[in-house]
């Protein structure tokens, strides 16, 4: 079955803003509380550690994007280095993580809306899934346009948190960490979820006008911008509300704003959180569908999933993602669905970092001299940091990720993946 190409229409600024949108997203709104409970006033340091891990991994994505600027980057990059079977494992792990993350945030949206309107969480989550499905069907440009508007709203909420906390910065001791390095590392493992999204930019490679030039730039822009915002949010949050109280709050950032500006500001921030959660889900669903498209086009998933509709959207892949998402939000809880996401993502990132290190060491990248050394050392450090955070992700998450790895390795061994036409 012939694979129809996607339409190349996205510019650098469109992809950069969508990257900022999916990274900023809902994770920080919900997870900054539990992270503060672990790290204390040194919460900012946990964001730096998580951001450093994500940023060094983003370097691997940026370098590898020049070699394989195609959708489903985890599959493409790992397969380029180690073959299609490991690529299948890495790509499918990230695909599962994306769908799990989208379901997690959708349930979070449902909870926020239930708090404001009183309608059941599951009904709200399903309604959001249907509404975003309609937006996705319109096409990638329309989806990105909606995402850019929502990105502005979610950034406004975080800037509000920063502003209300700035006057209290000088009086705050930012080195107080009751649990020391262990607490900071555990907090970094928790809030690593808030950095997920930069990797999704690779799933828009086949719809970018100049992916070889613009994809690495978009990765750099989105990572730097979001890390700066996150650190400033962390500084303000613990300056206004005690870290222990943040850890016990279901809506920590709303608590921060409400403490300074009153209960009406609390409601405003909750509305902005709805925009943040909706934006994250929209971009995760769009990226997940294109990841499936990329793997189907490469021959490791059924060719039908590479079918492109009249709006230049991978229709069957999108329907599959929406269906799985709907099932997850009905049968799962926020904690159940979110439990393994970080661990699965960290394992997939380890595959990507190992891929760049291996390709550079074997002189299979076009770089020379110092740049080739950097392509070996930087992903090696990122690999170690990913492993460090993985060890602090919790036993249940580790066991779940290990179980998925075993299942995918068995599926890859029993299938005919090497003969499915993977294109290097």
Give, region by region, the residue ranges found by the protein language model:
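Helix-loop-helix connectors at the membrane interface of multi-pass transporters/channels
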Residues: 1, 79, 105-125, 207-212, ...
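TM-loop-TM module centered on a large, flexible mid-protein loop between adjacent transmembrane helices
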Residues: 76-79, 83, 114-119, 220-285, ...
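Membrane-interface "cap" regions at the ends of multi-pass membrane proteins
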Residues: 1-31, 38-42, 55, 59, ...
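Hydrophobic transmembrane alpha-helices that form the core helical bundles
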Residues: 34-38, 55-129, 134-142, 151, ...
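Helix-loop-helix junctions that connect adjacent transmembrane segments
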Residues: 2-6, 43-44, 118-123, 127, ...
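Small-residue-rich segments of transmembrane alpha-helices in multi-pass membrane proteins
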Residues: 18-26, 151-164, 222-230, 352, ...
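A generic transmembrane alpha-helix motif of multi-pass inner-membrane proteins
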Residues: 344, 372-424
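Transmembrane alpha-helical segments of multi-pass small-molecule transport proteins
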Residues: 47-49, 116-140, 158-161, 315-324, ...
């Amino acid at each position: 079955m012939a694979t129809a190409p996607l339409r190349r229409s996205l510019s650098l600024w469109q992809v950069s803003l969508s990257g900022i949108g999916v990274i900023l997203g809902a994770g920080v709104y919900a997870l900054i509380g539990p992270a503060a409970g672990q790290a204390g006033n040194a919460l900012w340091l946990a964001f730096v550690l998580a951001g450093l891990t994500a940023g060094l991994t983003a370097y691997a994505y940026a370098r590898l994007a020049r070699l394989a600027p195609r959708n489903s980057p985890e599959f493409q990059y790992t397969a380029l280095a180690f073959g299609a079977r490991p690529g299948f494992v890495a790509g499918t792990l990230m695909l599962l993580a994306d769908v799990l993350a989208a379901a997690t945030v959708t349930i979070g949206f449902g909870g926020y809306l239930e708090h404001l309107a009183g309608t059941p969480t599951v009904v709200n989550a399903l309604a959001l899934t249907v509404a975003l499905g309609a937006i996705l069907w319109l096409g990638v440009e329309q989806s990105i346009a909606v995402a850019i508007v929502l990105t502005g709203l979610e950034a406004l909420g975080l800037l509000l948190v920063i502003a209300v906390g700035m006057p209290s910065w000088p009086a705050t001791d930012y080195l107080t960490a009751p649990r020391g390095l262990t607490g900071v590392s555990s907090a970094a493992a928790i809030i690593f979820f808030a950095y997920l999204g930069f990797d999704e930019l690779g799933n828009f490679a086949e719809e970018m006008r100049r992916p070889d030039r613009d994809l690495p730039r978009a990765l750099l822009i989105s990572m730097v911008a979001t890390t700066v915002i996150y650190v400033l949010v962390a500084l303000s949050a613990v300056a206004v509300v005690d870290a222990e109280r943040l850890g016990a709050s279901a809506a920590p950032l709303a608590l921060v704003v409400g403490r300074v500006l009153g209960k009406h500001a609390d409601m405003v921030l909750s509305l902005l959180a709805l925009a943040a959660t909706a934006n994250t889900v929209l971009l995760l669903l769009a990226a997940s569908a294109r990841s499936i498209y990329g793997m189907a086009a490469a021959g490791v998933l059924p060719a039908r999933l590479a079918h492109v509709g009249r709006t230049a959207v991978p229709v069957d892949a999108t329907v599959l993602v929406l269906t799985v998402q709907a099932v997850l939000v009905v049968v799962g809880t926020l904690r159940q669905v979110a439990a393994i996401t970080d661990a699965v993502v960290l394992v997939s990132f380890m595959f990507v970092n190992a891929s760049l290190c291996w390709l550079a060491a074997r002189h299979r990248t076009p770089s020379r001299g110092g740049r080739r050394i950097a392509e070996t050392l930087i992903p090696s450090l990122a690999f170690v940091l990913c492993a460090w955070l993985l060890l602090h992700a919790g036993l249940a998450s580790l066991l779940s990720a290990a179980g998925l790895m075993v299942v995918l390795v068995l599926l890859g061994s029993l299938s005919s993946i090497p003969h499915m036409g993977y294109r290097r």
